[in-house]
Amino acid sequence: MIEKNYQPADIEARMSVVWEDSLAFKAGRPDRRDAVPFTIVIPPPNVTGSLHMGHALNNTLQDILCRFERMRGRDVLWQPGTDHAGIATQMVVERQLMERQQPGRREMGREKFLERVWQWKAESGDTIINQLKRLGASCDWSRERFTMDEGLSKAVIKVFVELHRDGLIYKDKRLVNWDTKLLTAISDLEVQQTEVKGSLWYLRYPIEGKTFSPEDPSSFIVVATTRPETMLGDTGVAVHPDDERYQKLIGKHVILPLVGRKVEIVADDYSDPEKGSGAVKVTPAHDFNDFEVGNRHGLRRISVLDKEGCLDLLDNEDYLRDLPEGAAQFAEEFNKVDRFVARKRIVERLESFGFVERIEPHTHMVPHGDRSNSVIEPYLTDQWYVDAKTLAKPAIAAVRSGETSFVPKNWEKTYFEWMENIQPWCISRQLWWGHQIPAWYGPDGKVFVAETEEEAISHALGYYVEQEVITAEQGREMALDRNKREGFITRDEDVLDTWFSSALWPFSTLGWPEDAPEVQRYYPTNALVTGFDIIFFWVARMMMMGLHFMKEVPFSTIYIHALVRDEKGAKMSKSKGNVIDPLHLIDEYGADALRFTLAAMAAQGRDIKLATSRVEGYRNFATKLWNASRFAEMNHCAVPEGFEPAKAKETLNRWIAHESAHTTREVTEAIEAYRFNDAAGAIYRFVWNVYCDWYVELAKPVLLGPDSPAKDETRAMVAWARDEILKLLHPFMPFITEELWEVTAKRDGLLALAAWPLKPAEPTPEQLAMFAAAAGPTDPLISPALIVPIFDHADFTDPKAEAEIGWVIDLVTQIRSVRAEMNIPPATLTALVLAGASAETRERAPRWTDVIKRMARLSDISFADRAPDGAVQLLVRGEVAALPLKGVIDVAAERTRLDKEIGKADADIKRAESKLANEKFVANAAEEVVEEEREKREAALARKAKLLEALERLKQAS
């Protein structure tokens, strides 16, 4: 029996247990062993994470696909798991140690600290997984993986060793994003560009061989910089090759102020003649663009900062080389001074010598670490790299050939732009938590890469015996006695970038590199659902690794969803205070309401503007379904054994079967095409408008009337249509549908494993002709009816039934619309005249007279050859229906009211258009504010159009 009130929390708790106990989501179930597999790997959330709105959207869409395919009979594997999240996790544990006033990481040592991290993971690492379960994610939780699991770690080590063997992993000295607080390289994804109000310093660099004078422009070149402290590492000045001002200076030198180093003037397209002086300082060791300029011209790379962001000058051979006498004194004075303190002091020193031409206020973007919030330094250091350019070629080809496709397709352009300009991938991190790099160093720094330390020792001993560094006898002794080789080789302390292990996720989670049957069955996966922000960092790298090691693409389709923003379109952020917590929404409205909201708003390529009111609205939608199901139960509606909708005799029942078939097709095709919003919209309209508002209302006289064959058939059809709704709605709202499936009838199994409704076949030409004849003529000027005739047919489709019920609905809908437009009070009944009605209308109208009168608030329905004077005329499926309003409303007063409302709409339109015509407003206002004005204008235009239509109708009645 269905409870009186819909209580989402109780249902969600109960259904979660039912699904778990029944192993409903287990891949490879005995009843699916021969089924076609369908695989999705979850984008593994950070083990430190908590469910945010992006997770909620991403996992709702994945779950819709998985539940849909499971109901279609597929053997579904939705592979769950979490990412070890190197920096984030290490920071969480370090912060915890600090808060508890316990020894820090350095004091504990690596081994003890890692034990503590694993302890934290055991205690707190399931938070995000439990939250995903609350959302209703139908993953195979028995297969949950963690990127630091033993099996996945084995895959990581094997991939590193093989790529190194093939020359695709190597060590190099290049610039990285360096976090001076965390003391590690970080990825581009972990860098946030923050707008900062700073300064632009214009500096005078004296030309070699000329006597410098601030009053003599021919004695110096002016360069501009936002980071004066890095000038100590300048090794060049770049000018554009076509800039006539500097033609004679190319190849000559300037003398670096304060330092005295000779710096070459080079010609390079990087310099923009239109910006500033047209000359730029080149600091290859402290700027990514300068690094490339330096490579093109063979300029020295002089790093002048240490890992903590302090000047590093005194023991810096690169810096001190070829400097004039007296430079050491400057180095001693500024050595180990913090970069920002040094900036101020260097500028003061430059000003004292006349080397500063001017200083301008300058607002610019400065990179910050997303976790430490410290200013990121481009830092020259030895790191491990992947030859991404080589690995990218097959990944580019796979998308170009269509082997893997993006949805929406426009994301392919983004993918190609990045992949075709890909840079070496820095994969080493100066952390303790993560996959330690499988590389060992011999006494002379020689690198030995191996899967195990024993293997590395073997390689090292063989090498040093061959090089005659040790004797063969020493080699044998060291091989046999661990004590004798203690400390002979030392392991690289760095760990791998988190994205390295994540790149293997589609196959490492299945058991690779072991010959696991799951690899054969579930790889490649079918689809990947993810956000656009990790196309480069994760999607592209999975493509590269999958093709290299599995020789197949990891997924055939990549669906890229948009962002979830606040209701005004602003990006959610803690600083703005506009973050919406999905768990709060689940507590308040239920997981089903949140899921349906996100799906209904997930239009391809369009960000979601999430308002709490929308979630509340879809909770009301769930309540309406609940109440409709209770109504069916109270009226003893049930599907008898052997019931066939195709054999229904009542027109109303054949109509709902037709609409159900049409909706099945709409929902099925929309999900197949990743048009989640269209699928949600179709099922919403069917439940709320077709089933609840029309079918149940039209069926009430039969259900509440005396027993009859028609009543028995209607009871069966009400229950059958409800069951079809539960099936179609289940991927979107799994909890309420599973609950109603269980309590409305005795079932053989779970709704989660029930068969998806069949999609109807295309109509035959004969059926099309029959439908056209039944529908009658149409007028393109009339607004579309609530129920649009669709040429979709299953065995039970009846175009004649659709034409008849569609006529009733169109008629009632248009009458209600006119009553609302004309401000006719609900208690006031009006007459209806069917003018010049066809024989078919004269035949069908009496069957529905009582229903139409009740639903349209009519006093009488009559027939006439023409519409009476003073009546508003409606065109319903090509025929005239007239509402005589003489004496019903005060026409003059209503016209005055409408004119006033039109004036208000005009004022709103003018106000919005004035703002939108203001170029300064459009250029400077926040994007969401501009969009809000556009929406106001469109709403006012639509309101005015309806008011004008009402005014036109009023003229008919006067």
From Swiss-Prot:
<protein>
    <recommendedName>
        <fullName>Valine--tRNA ligase</fullName>
        <ecNumber>6.1.1.9</ecNumber>
    </recommendedName>
</protein>
<dbReference type="GO" id="GO:0006438">
    <property type="term" value="P:valyl-tRNA aminoacylation"/>
</dbReference>
<comment type="subunit">
    <text>Monomer.</text>
</comment>
<dbReference type="Pfam" id="PF00133">
    <property type="entry name" value="tRNA-synt_1"/>
</dbReference>
<dbReference type="GO" id="GO:0005829">
    <property type="term" value="C:cytosol"/>
</dbReference>
<feature type="binding site">
    <location>
        <position position="574"/>
    </location>
    <ligand>
        <name>ATP</name>
    </ligand>
</feature>
<dbReference type="InterPro" id="IPR010978">
    <property type="entry name" value="tRNA-bd_arm"/>
</dbReference>
<keyword id="KW-0648">Protein biosynthesis</keyword>
<dbReference type="Pfam" id="PF08264">
    <property type="entry name" value="Anticodon_1"/>
</dbReference>
<dbReference type="Pfam" id="PF10458">
    <property type="entry name" value="Val_tRNA-synt_C"/>
</dbReference>
<dbReference type="GO" id="GO:0005524">
    <property type="term" value="F:ATP binding"/>
</dbReference>
<dbReference type="InterPro" id="IPR009008">
    <property type="entry name" value="Val/Leu/Ile-tRNA-synth_edit"/>
</dbReference>
<feature type="short sequence motif" description="'HIGH' region">
    <location>
        <begin position="45"/>
        <end position="55"/>
    </location>
</feature>
<dbReference type="InterPro" id="IPR001412">
    <property type="entry name" value="aa-tRNA-synth_I_CS"/>
</dbReference>
<dbReference type="InterPro" id="IPR013155">
    <property type="entry name" value="M/V/L/I-tRNA-synth_anticd-bd"/>
</dbReference>
<keyword id="KW-0436">Ligase</keyword>
<dbReference type="InterPro" id="IPR019499">
    <property type="entry name" value="Val-tRNA_synth_tRNA-bd"/>
</dbReference>
<keyword id="KW-0030">Aminoacyl-tRNA synthetase</keyword>
<comment type="similarity">
    <text>Belongs to the class-I aminoacyl-tRNA synthetase family. ValS type 1 subfamily.</text>
</comment>
<feature type="short sequence motif" description="'KMSKS' region">
    <location>
        <begin position="571"/>
        <end position="575"/>
    </location>
</feature>
<comment type="function">
    <text>Catalyzes the attachment of valine to tRNA(Val). As ValRS can inadvertently accommodate and process structurally similar amino acids such as threonine, to avoid such errors, it has a 'posttransfer' editing activity that hydrolyzes mischarged Thr-tRNA(Val) in a tRNA-dependent manner.</text>
</comment>
<feature type="coiled-coil region">
    <location>
        <begin position="892"/>
        <end position="958"/>
    </location>
</feature>
<dbReference type="GO" id="GO:0002161">
    <property type="term" value="F:aminoacyl-tRNA deacylase activity"/>
</dbReference>
<keyword id="KW-0963">Cytoplasm</keyword>
<dbReference type="InterPro" id="IPR002303">
    <property type="entry name" value="Valyl-tRNA_ligase"/>
</dbReference>
<keyword id="KW-0067">ATP-binding</keyword>
<keyword id="KW-0547">Nucleotide-binding</keyword>
<dbReference type="InterPro" id="IPR002300">
    <property type="entry name" value="aa-tRNA-synth_Ia"/>
</dbReference>
<keyword id="KW-0175">Coiled coil</keyword>
<dbReference type="InterPro" id="IPR033705">
    <property type="entry name" value="Anticodon_Ia_Val"/>
</dbReference>
<dbReference type="InterPro" id="IPR014729">
    <property type="entry name" value="Rossmann-like_a/b/a_fold"/>
</dbReference>
<dbReference type="GO" id="GO:0004832">
    <property type="term" value="F:valine-tRNA ligase activity"/>
</dbReference>
<dbReference type="InterPro" id="IPR009080">
    <property type="entry name" value="tRNAsynth_Ia_anticodon-bd"/>
</dbReference>
<dbReference type="InterPro" id="IPR037118">
    <property type="entry name" value="Val-tRNA_synth_C_sf"/>
</dbReference>
